[in-house]
Amino acid sequence: MRKNRRHEDELREVKITRNYLKHPQGSVLIEVGDTKVICTAALEAKVPPFLRNSGKGWLTAEYAMLPMATQERNQRESVRGHIGGRTHEIQRLIGRSLRAVTDLDSLGENTVYIDCDVIQADGGTRTASITGSFVALVDLFRKMKEKGICETMPIRDYVSAVSVGVVDGQLLLDLEYEEDSRADVDMNVVMTGAGEFIEVQGTAERVPFGRDRLTAMVELAGRGIRKLTEVQREILGGQI
């Protein structure tokens, strides 16, 4: 039995609070166990140079952590004067994941900015950021449609993400930091509501894994994704 008496195939408690901030068109606080991330979605009427005069839109993401989101204070990257490799990797992952379910052609020449700020970290911050940002994105798109910026909802499907790993020989879903820090294998999986893969990031931290273990990890992640999609569907009222 894991912390909080969780089973090996059980997600942490997930709570998503919509309209968490006053100013963004879309904003949520997502809580996955003790991990807490504020996700916002905002629209700007311009696109990167490579999309000018194309009639198409763009979506990009930024990710950051509060200095005391972890047990020991980390210096802000803005103070250090550069963004670290981990942050770059996570930002690109969030952006790719959301673009995969967004109809960029229907956005017009507008850019959606997704901002994810981790206020408390206990493992799974990048997966929580993707899951929460999707809800903020849908709220933004609903407001765009209401204002006539787009004729239809520029969203194709749900998207969420979850971690799986092997710890002490056991296959676990949705790793907390303590589990992740001693995992033999660590994997992050991003999937659509229809069960299609957007990204699979798997690493043998200590022990290589075979094809059967890989299949089992992907199947376990898929079960977790289905539950996360249900949470998103419920919080959004069942329609996107």
UniProtKB/Swiss-Prot annotation:
Gene3D superfamilies found in the cross-reference section: GHMP Kinase, N-terminal domain
GO MF term list? 3'-5'-RNA exonuclease activity; tRNA binding; tRNA nucleotidyltransferase activity
Subunit and partners: Homohexameric ring arranged as a trimer of dimers.
Entry keywords, A to Z:
Nucleotidyltransferase, RNA-binding, rRNA processing, Transferase, tRNA processing, tRNA-binding
**According to its UniProt record, which reaction does this protein catalyse?**
tRNA(n+1) + phosphate = tRNA(n) + a ribonucleoside 5'-diphosphate
Under the heading CDD domains, the entry gives: RNase_PH_bact
EC assignment = 2.7.7.56
Q: Which PANTHER family match?
A: EXOSOME COMPLEX COMPONENT, EXOSOME COMPLEX COMPONENT RRP41
Q: What biological function has been recorded for the protein in this entry?
A: Phosphorolytic 3'-5' exoribonuclease that plays an important role in tRNA 3'-end maturation. Removes nucleotide residues following the 3'-CCA terminus of tRNAs; can also add nucleotides to the ends of RNA molecules by using nucleoside diphosphates as substrates, but this may not be physiologically important. Probably plays a role in initiation of 16S rRNA degradation (leading to ribosome degradation) during starvation.
UniProt xrefs under InterPro entries = ExoRNase_PH_dom1 (IPR001247), ExoRNase_PH_dom2 (IPR015847), ExoRNase_PH_dom2_sf (IPR036345), PNPase/RNase_PH_dom_sf (IPR027408), Ribosomal_Su5_D2-typ_SF (IPR020568), RNase_PH (IPR050080), RNase_PH_bac-type (IPR002381), RNase_PH_CS (IPR018336)
Tell me what this protein is called: Ribonuclease PH
Sites binding phosphate sit at R86, G124, T125, R126
- A Pfam family reported for this protein in Swiss-Prot or TrEMBL: RNase_PH
The primary gene name is rph
Q: Which family does this protein fall into?
A: Belongs to the RNase PH family.
Please name every pair of cysteines joined by a disulfide bond in this record: none
> A biological process (GO) annotation for this entry?
tRNA processing
What organism is listed for this UniProt entry?
Answer: Syntrophus aciditrophicus (strain SB)
